[in-house]
């Protein structure tokens, strides 16, 4: 029974391989990738990008919280970010180890990953946001559309 339910969530997620947007603004993504390594600056830029994406997809906004500490390790896994769907909060851990911030690119990748969970719940109305082929395809598509500059 559990296996059927798990397969259902994966197959449902895999039906959506791209995000529903033709063009996205480059400015917010650029601001995030060039905001420096301080947690306060990253929080402002991450919240601005998240607000922009929520407005673009017409979904409820979520709060971004940046923890100026090391990534937690649980059960042998390191968590760079978490999405709390019932509170609509994205948590991102700023430091790789004691007082060494992660790179801007890694920080942006974690934000897009956690935002995709929010997108799954509130735009695609999936009952569970699983790490499927479709999930990672949507992240790649979102990142490519954000990085594309208008000419």
Regions found by a protein language model. Give the residues of each.
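N-terminal low-structure segments adjacent to metalloprotease catalytic domains
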Residues: 1-37
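Metal-dependent catalytic neighborhoods of phosphoester/phosphodiester hydrolases
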Residues: 128
